[in-house]
Amino acid sequence: MLDVCICTHNPNRQLFEIILQALANQTLSKDRYQVWVIDNASDRPIEIADLAILSAAGINFKLLLAPKLGLMYAREVAISATSGEWIIFVDDDNELTPNYLATALELAENNPKLGCFGGKLLLPKDTRHANWVKAMLPYLAIKDMGDTVLSNCVNYWGEWEPPGAGCVLKREVLEVFQRRIATLSPQFVLGRQGKSLLSAEDSMITRGAYELGLECAYQPRLELIHHLKPQRFTFRYLLRLLYGYGRSYVLLERILGNPVAAIEGRSMITFIMRKITFRIKDTQSIQQCLCMVAWDLGYLHESRQIQES
């Protein structure tokens, strides 16, 4: 049995119907999966009537409320409510291809060393964005590493580590995550929370696999369409996003008990100019360069919090 969990906050209702219809169109027998919709403090609450597509398809589903705003809190509600061996997290803008769940279950059952895995996350074919944005797509959870399986069991990030969108996770891995967040102080809360663009919660979840001696994997047979809002391709949004990534990296390393090098004795202007000089060598556009410098500034901000604490 698969537990398919959709954590949502103020979803686009038209797109949400597409996401639900994709679940209704799955080739996997309806008695092999259950859908859980977790409403995370939406201004207009999700109602049972909004899930009529699932009901009409004969899918077993439940609607849960997560009143405390934050993706981490919504996922914790989902984990606590479910009981299956495998959980799939589906974002409210993830359109699963028809064989997604059947393939996920097959891979889970035939690969006992897997702790978590995901696949290709593709943009709709009619998506338009500036050319420079292409290099930034991985930071927007757009991923296509080709058709070769990638897997590993090492305690650091690599292309085998799946984003949270469409991620398939063994319950034991999520139990490690639950134990970890139970001891976290508010300053270490990762994941989206309102307008906050902190991230790395996905990495915190998947690192639990390594602690159990299980692998993370990229499985290219899995595909979903990631419907992103046009604003996410803007320079302003990507600057904010990468700044959040830089902060999140420091927070994640501290949560995992790893040392973080503090940056000392430099003025902000000196720091920025040195980083631009360094980044410009490895980037394809000035916009990409400045976005990566925003990552560095996020790292600087959070690492200095260590010095001041």
Kindly give the residue locations of the regions a language model identified.
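N-proximal low-complexity "stem/linker" segments adjacent to membrane-targeting elements
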Residues: M1-N25
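Short, flexible, basic/aromatic active-site loop/helix in glycosyltransferases
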Residues: L137-E159
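Short aromatic/hydrophobic "clamp" motif used to bind/position activated sugar donors
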Residues: I87
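Non-catalytic, C-terminal membrane-associated alpha-helical segments of glycosyltransferases
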Residues: R240-G244, G257-S309
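Acidic donor-binding segment of Leloir-type glycosyltransferases
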Residues: L20-L65
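Conserved donor NDP-sugar-binding/catalytic core segment of glycosyltransferases
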Residues: N99-V133
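Acidic donor-binding loop at a coil-to-helix junction in glycosyltransferase catalytic cores
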Residues: L184-I205
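Glycine-rich, basic loop-to-helix element that forms the pyrophosphate-binding segment
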Residues: A66-T82
